Amino acid sequence: MSEPIENLTVDAVLEAVGLFCPEPVMMLHQKVRDLPAGGLLKVIATDPSTRRDIPKFCVFLGHELVAEQAEEGTFLYWIRKKPD
């Protein structure tokens, strides 16, 4: 990644705190649909299964997982929607 995560400008945030599989990925799917092509989404989740599910979601649908972080039981993801 060319710039620090703190410097990224996000277009939308998805808070999936306290939700468990499959809800975070279902919500992610809808939120990505609403983004413009190339838009950046930040996801905040607490379900550890998102560490597996969100990267697979990005690969399967062609979106870019720009960055991910884990902080004391909270999982953060920055996802760039694929171009049209």
Swiss-Prot record:
It is found in: Cytoplasm. Keywords: Cytoplasm. Pfam families: TusA (PF01206). The keyword Ligase does not apply. GO terms for cellular component: cytoplasm. The active site is at residue 21. InterPro entries: Sulphur_carrier_TusA, TusA-like, TusA-like_sf. It comes from the Bacteria. CDD domains: SirA. Coiled coil: none annotated. One of its GO terms (molecular function) is sulfur carrier activity. PROSITE patterns: UPF0033. SUPFAM superfamilies: SirA-like. Sulfur carrier protein which probably makes part of a sulfur-relay system. This is Sulfur carrier protein TusA. It comes from Pseudomonas savastanoi pv. phaseolicola (strain 1448A / Race 6).
